[in-house]
């Protein structure tokens, strides 16, 4: 019901619904709301039998008219640098079909991607997804840790000429039920500081005009009286 409500709201409100890294389920599709397909290290929805990235499966699923953007999840504010595991006991037939994973086995989402491991490989992966999806907007989500690592990504963009369409800056304030409390509360650059860093880096490298910035991670708004 929650996923259906989110997607129905996106449809009614004219905005997009992020799938999260668990893949695209029938519940995401039921109401026809626009989707941002998030792809994490588990590659759910585009996963090979060995657990790696399957380009042909990605091409098939990204062709859906509902999928408007694709987001590569590098890290998240709730648990930056931390992977995840879905115990075998929780892998139901439905989850097996949605995620493309076998029943009876633990499902690992490792801390890092296997499709790339360097900034140059990351931007080349962005290009690969853009080509396979027929030119749909491709970006990545990141919780800033070591500032020099984001600078390295900017340098890779300049060197290759390959730029993401958007970057999602996830503040360290973000949370999730599956995150260890040490990671949730004490790791990751705070949202405002991270936004300033990303804005300044992209501007300094002459990249800002071509890349949209999206802020997430316990982002709230209220009205002052």
Ranges and model annotations:
Residues 110-225:
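Glycine-rich phosphate/ribose-binding loops and adjacent secondary-structure elements
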Residues 1-111, 121:
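N-terminal capping/small domains of soluble enzymes
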């Amino acid at each position: 019901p929650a996923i259906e409500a989110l997607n129905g709201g996106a449809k009614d409100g004219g905005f997009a619904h992020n799938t999260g890294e668990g893949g695209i389920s029938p519940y995401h599709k039921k109401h026809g709301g626009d989707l941002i397909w998030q792809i994490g290290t588990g590659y759910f929805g585009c996963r090979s039998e060995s657990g790696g990235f399957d380009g042909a499966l990605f091409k098939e699923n990204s062709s859906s008219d509902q999928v408007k953007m694709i987001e590569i999840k590098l890290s998240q504010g709730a648990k930056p640098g931390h992977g995840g595991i879905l115990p075998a006991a929780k892998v139901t037939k439905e989850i097996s079909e949605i995620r493309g994973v076998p029943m009876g086995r633990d499902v690992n989402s490792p801390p890092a991607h296997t499709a790339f491991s360097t900034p140059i490989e990351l931007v080349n992966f962005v290009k690969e997804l853009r080509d396979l999806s027929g030119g749909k907007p491709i970006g990545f989500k990141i919780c800033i840790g070591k500032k020099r690592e984001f600078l390295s990504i900017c340098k890779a963009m300049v060197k290759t000429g390959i730029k993401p369409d958007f970057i999602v800056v996830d503040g360290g304030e973000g949370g999730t039920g599956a995150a260890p409390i040490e990671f949730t509360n004490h790791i990751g650059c705070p949202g405002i500081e991270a936004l300033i860093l990303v804005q300044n880096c992209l501007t300094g490298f002459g990249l800002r005009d071509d890349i949209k910035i999206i802020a997430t991670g316990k982002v709230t708004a209220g009205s002052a009286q």
